[in-house]
Amino acid sequence: MATGTDQAVGFGLVAVSLIIFTYYTTWVILLPFIDSQHVIHKYFLPRAYAVLLPLAAGLLLLLFVGLFITYVMLKSQKITKKAQ
């Protein structure tokens, strides 16, 4: 059973994810159909970042996954060498 802290952290992560999803969806899907002089445009970054930010996040994710796999493989080789 999850503790109160676990539930609070989980709720916070879900809330942040929903906010990011709503913001990004509005930015990418709805904003191109709204007049460029409308007030809502000042709350969003330029459209070029709509591609660059997810691309950078994906590259960072791949980097950290690759580093983790490399670390685990090197650690596994050291343990195997010690056992021999």
Curated annotation (Swiss-Prot):
This protein's record includes keyword Electron transport: no
Alphabetical UniProt keywords: Endoplasmic reticulum, Membrane, Transmembrane, Transmembrane helix
Coiled-coil region list: none
Record InterPro entries: DPM2
Pfam family, one: DPM2
Domain of life: Eukaryota
Membrane topology type: Multi-pass membrane protein
Residue intervals passing through the bilayer: 11-31, 49-69
Molecular function GO labels: dolichyl-phosphate beta-D-mannosyltransferase activity; enzyme regulator activity
Keyword presence, Nucleotide-binding: no
Pathway this chain belongs to: Protein modification; protein glycosylation
Major localization class: endoplasmic reticulum
The protein's assembly and partners: Component of the dolichol-phosphate mannose (DPM) synthase complex composed of DPM1, DPM2 and DPM3; in the complex interacts directly with DPM3. Component of the glycosylphosphatidylinositol-N-acetylglucosaminyltransferase (GPI-GnT) complex composed at least by PIGA, PIGC, PIGH, PIGP, PIGQ, PIGY and DPM2. Interacts with PIGA, PIGC and PIGQ.
Similarity annotation: Belongs to the DPM2 family.
Name this polypeptide is given: Dolichol phosphate-mannose biosynthesis regulatory protein
Organism of this sequence: Mus musculus
